[in-house]
Amino acid sequence: MTSYHAMAHRGDVGNGEDVVVHGLGGIGLSAVHIANALGANVIGVDLFDEKLDKAESLGAVETVNASEVDDAAKEVQDITNGGADCSVDALGIETTCLNAVNSLKKGGRHVQVGLTTSEEAGQVPLPTDEFVAKEIDFRGSLGLQPSRYSEMLDMIKTGKLDPTELVSETISIDEVPDKLAAMSDYDTMGIPVCSDFS
């Protein structure tokens, strides 16, 4: 739901647009899947090949391993011949936010989904002059209003979206605390689902 609102409403992603998603955890991979379903050419950026491979299986046309390049934003600029129409920071750390913003073309839209960590404490320095010179929009995104659930559910019903592709594993209620801790350490891929409440 969070990624649907970010892509369909706040990012206003359209058919044929270039969309780059920085940070391929559960939210980021969901954003890849949804942007692809909306007709975008999606680029996934992360540090881990396993997450990049998953992004490709969800529809990313290109991926960038940020640990293997000097400048992830420049890689995206090169892939898109000048920058993405829409960027997403699904992680919330300074590096991913700046890389996402710097991946945009003139007139691009940045969607901030990831909340910052304790290190950033809600503050990330941004290239303000670039926002002005390139007329970049910065948009926050949080959740999905219940009145808009039907849009997303219709895409699931018609097969454009398949949430089961995002499920990384099923876990018991006893495993939830450890999985939540692993998410805080960015040590998960996809979305674990609790299916055993006994």
PLM segments and residue spans:
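Structural signature of beta-strand start/N-cap positions in the alpha/beta core
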Residues: 18, 41, 83-85, 109
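Glycine-rich phosphate-binding loop and adjacent beta-alpha segment
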Residues: 94-158, 196-198
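Mid-domain Rossmann-like dinucleotide-binding core that forms the NAD(H)/NADP(H) cofactor-binding site
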Residues: 1-69, 74
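A generic alpha-to-beta junction signature in SAM-dependent methyltransferases
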Residues: 13, 80, 91, 102-105
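A short acidic, Gly/Pro-enriched loop at the edge of an enzyme's catalytic core
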Residues: 70-87
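Glycine- and other small-residue-rich loops at beta-strand/loop junctions that grip anionic moieties
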Residues: 21-24, 44-45, 64-66, 85-89, ...
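C-terminal hydrophobic helical "lid"/dimerization subdomain
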Residues: 82, 98-102, 145-198
